[in-house]
Amino acid sequence: VTTQQLLTPAEAAELSGFSLDTLRYYERIGLLTAITRATSGHRRFTPDDLAWLGILRCLRDTGMPIADMRRYAELARTEGPAGLLDRIALLEQHDTAVNDHIALLERQRTHLREKIDWYRSLLPAG
């Protein structure tokens, strides 16, 4: 990785959609590891770090709890078939939870639309 490919924390935050505080927190709890440091000691993010942040963004946006995100990060650092199988299982479990949440949201949206239609029916004609 060349220094031109390294991003400041502010750039990584902007591109990932995470705040600087969240990036620091993720590093502190082990979701981000081995962050490169400039000679000044400041953190620098690589393209691989940014790709990893994209995965974390997906997991967070779909409601994965931090504990499960930490487990996923641990498994991502585990080599071999066992680590892969565990990652697949964790992601499949999360996919099921996401599908359940989508189904709930669709039912709630239907309820909202019915309520909107009801209120519109109460308006005077014309």
Located regions from the model:
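Arg/Lys-rich, alpha-helical DNA-contact motif
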Residues: 2-9, 14, 33, 47-126
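Short glycine/proline-centered loop/turn elements that form peptide/ligand docking sites
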Residues: 12, 19-22
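N-terminal helix-turn-helix
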Residues: 22-24, 36
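Conserved active-site tyrosine of GNAT-family acetyltransferases
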Residues: 26, 45
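Beta-hairpin "wing" of winged helix-turn-helix
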Residues: 32-40, 44
